[in-house]
Amino acid sequence: MPPEEWGPPIWTLFHCLAEKMKEESFPVVIKPLFGHIYKIASFLPCPECSQHAKSFLAKINPTRIKNKTDFKNILYVFHNAVNKRKNKALFNSEHLERFYAQRNLVNVFNRFIYVYNTNGNMKLLTESFHRKFVVSSFKKWMIENAKHFS
C-alpha cells in the first residue's frame, strides 16, 4: 500500500487526537499519547518514512509540551515538514482545526486501524507484526482514556 493511501488516515488520527483532546485532560494524556504516536510512527508501512518520523519526534520532549495548542502546533509543523520534503502543499493551521474538529474520532480511529494493519511485502513481515502489537496497545489505551476526548 503506497503512502498516499495509508498516510492520510494516520495524519487524520494524529490531528484529530490533538483537536479532540479535552483541554483539562492535557496534563494526564500528553505523555502516554505522545508515546503512542512515536510507536505508530516507528512502524509505518514505509521504513524510510518511519526513519524520518522517528528522527523528527525524537527531538521533542513531551514534558516540555505545555498545552493542547502547543501539541497541535507540533503536529502541524511535523506534517508540514513531511509535506515540504515530499514537495506537497503546506497546510494552513486554521484549515486543519476546522477540518479535524468535524471528524468523528471513532470513525477516524477505525480507518487508522484498517490501513495501519495492512500487510506489506514479505521483507516487512516483522514490521507488520509490530504494527499489530502497536494497534492492540493503542486501542486498549484509547478505550481506557476515551473520556479525555470529545
List each language-model region with its residue ranges.
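Aromatic-rich, lipid-facing transmembrane alpha helices and their immediate juxtamembrane interface loops
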Residues: 1-150
